[in-house]
A protein has these predicted regions:
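Hinge/lid segment of periplasmic solute-binding proteins
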Residues: 128-186, 259-291, 387-389
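Extracytoplasmic/periplasmic substrate-recognition and gating elements
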Residues: 94, 199, 332, 351-357, ...
Length: 560
């Protein structure tokens, strides 16, 4: 579910590509040790015989405690509705909702751990890799085999695990699931049909060159072609960052031949990797469910500047950077100071022709046309007809495959790791939310809200969506996913693997490049130097050493 400060705000959820995978590998085969300071907890785990009826069951009455929810930019009305639904079934539990602004959420969440175990329980945790590495969040895997009292089936049977990118056959004792992604998102282009018609564009672009020609016409007609934020947050973790990573993928798809697990590797799974074959015609060829990756092989390739992991002097990187610069000439005036809500306002008010978004805009735009706070106009603005199109493909001799997009399960709902009783209570809340009964409350609240929309079909079984939602989601064709992979686009195109000093340096470099102060050659030289400079500190932050890369087939030792 997305709260629209814009869909422009959306991927706070896709903030850090290296953190997107919910699984965190470790050598420790023990479960995360519970905190001794968890908040009020139930006296026992929910019974498998709990009733799914509207009235509280005996086991539900045994549940006692508090669940504190603080999500970024989330609809309070929606989550309060879910909380009320859960408390009606579990009268001994109090659920509080105190959602936070997107801006500063990562810092707020990190600060909660400064004095020990936080009061907050349910959070969005995809930005805080360090806290994940320190196992500050509850592991979901131990609860998958437990009975969901709201369905009377094992909880794992509630999920479409393939759609969630989870292969339980490949989960070992060193794997942890720190966040749950049971919704979906596909990044698409949204366009103002009226502007397209006014400037003589008869059909949506299929290629990048077609889109650049269309943007030229739009700009000459006095409109902003692309409503895009350009501040540092957007360049790293928001819509600008999406485009930087998505289009790099077209040129660097052969990364998988380096990053994939080899037969001798500790990450190798015969039942998965033994049948895999490289196939550029398959846009899902490198999906995590089809082939495993060895992070050490990726890191070694970055250090050795091997294949597509070499930036400077690589003609593929040069061709990609040249096209990227073309695209970023059509952004709003004062681009590097533009924030998400400002960019979204340009589209809402008919001043910009396109924006990046998700299927959630299908329902959210009509709400936002009438929203004075988002349009800046009394009574809102006159609605216009809008449509969607998929990512147009860059073309040229260096391109390896058609464009893909970010098309992944989302949510990133995690719980602070507390004592066993509190963890069990938190898991019970999620069992309710992901059940047909709980999810129906959630969807009904979204439909009734003014500030939330469903971004895609849920990866949940036995769920029935309203007919209009089912029809709308069927209109978005899958073209493949780039997100959550150990690819050069994700690990190098915005600086080194979301290591913040590197990201900050890259933002300065790319600003100079887009402003014409750096040539393509100079920009790529700076980016390569950036990666080299921060490589060892980045390794150490992830509790790895250069010596680990000498034997990528071996599991690295655990370090405190």
């Amino acid at each position: 579910m997305l709260n629209r400060k814009g869909s422009a705000v959306l991927l706070s959820m896709l903030m850090a590509s290296s953190v997107l995978a919910a699984c965190s590998k470790s050598n420790d085969t023990s479960e995360p040790s519970p905190s001794s300071s968890g908040s009020g907890a139930p006296t026992s785990e929910p019974s498998a015989s709990a009733s799914a009826s509207a009235s509280p069951s005996e086991s539900a009455q045994a549940l006692k405690g508090t669940i504190n929810i603080s999500l970024p930019n989330a609809s309070s009305s929606v989550w309060n509705a879910v909380a009320q639904g859960y408390m009606a079934k579990n009268p001994g539990v109090k659920v509080t909702v105190d959602n936070k602004p997107l801006e500063g959420y990562k810092e707020w969440l990190t600060a909660q751990f400064a004095a020990g175990t936080p009061d907050v329980d349910m959070v969005v945790n995809n930005e805080v890799a360090g806290l994940m590495n320190d196992r500050k969040f509850m592991d979901y895997y131990p609860y998958f085999d437990k009975q969901n009292p709201y369905t009377n089936k094992p909880w794992k049977d509630s999920f479409d695990l393939s759609a969630m990118g989870i292969n339980l056959d490949g989960v070992g004792p060193e794997d942890y699931l720190y966040n749950l992604n049971f919704e979906s998102v596909q990044i698409v282009w949204v366009y103002n049909k009226e502007i397209f018609q006014k400037v003589g564009i008869a059909q949506t672009p299929k290629t990048f060159d077609e889109m650049m020609n269309d943007f030229k016409k739009i700009k000459e007609a006095g409109y902003t072609p692309l409503a895009l934020a350009g501040n540092s947050n957007s360049m790293w973790s928001g819509q600008a960052g999406w485009l930087v990573r998505i289009y790099a993928d077209q040129y660097l798809r052969d990364y998988i031949n380096i990053a994939r697990s080899q037969e001798q590797d500790y990450t190798y799974l015969p039942e998965v990797d033994g049948t895999w074959k490289y196939d550029l015609n398959d846009p899902f060829n490198d999906a995590n469910s089809k082939v495993t990756k060895n992070e050490l092989r990726q890191l070694k390739a970055i250090k050795d500047k091997a294949g597509p992991y070499k930036i400077e002097g690589n003609p593929k990187w040069a061709a990609y950077a040249d096209n990227l610069k073309r695209l970023f000439q059509y952004v709003p005036s004062g681009f590097f100071g533009v924030k998400d809500d400002q960019a979204y306002n340009l589209f809402l008010t008919g001043k910009a022709a396109t924006m990046m978004s998700t299927p959630a805009s299908y329902w959210q735009l009509p709400k936002d046309f009438a929203d004075e706070s988002k349009t800046g106009a009394k009574g809102g603005v006159k609605p216009f007809e809008y449509g969607f199109y998929n990512m147009p493909s860059m073309e040229g001799p260096e391109v390896m495959a058609p464009a893909r997009t970010i098309q992944i399960p989302i949510g990133f709902y995690g719980f602070v790791n507390k004592n066993a009783e509190q963890n069990a209570l938190n898991a019970d809340f999620m069992m309710y939310l992901t059940s047909p009964e709980g999810y129906a409350v959630y969807v009904k609240a979204i439909q009734a809200s003014s500030d939330a929309s469903l971004s895609g079909a849920p990866a949940l079984k036995d769920i029935t969506l309203p007919p209009e939602m089912t029809k709308a989601f069927a209109d978005f064709s899958p073209i493949g996913n780039t997100e959550g992979y150990q690819s050069p686009g994700n690990s190098l195109a915005r600086g080194l693997m979301d290591y913040q000093p590197s990201v900050q340096d890259w933002v300065g470099s790319v600003q100079r490049f887009f402003d014409g102060k750096l040539t393509t050659e100079q920009y790529l030289k700076e980016l390569q130097a950036n990666v080299d400079k921060y490589f060892v500190p980045m390794l150490k932050q992830g509790k790895k050493e250069l010596s680990d890369l000498d034997t990528p087939e071996r599991r690295p030792p655990e370090r405190k």
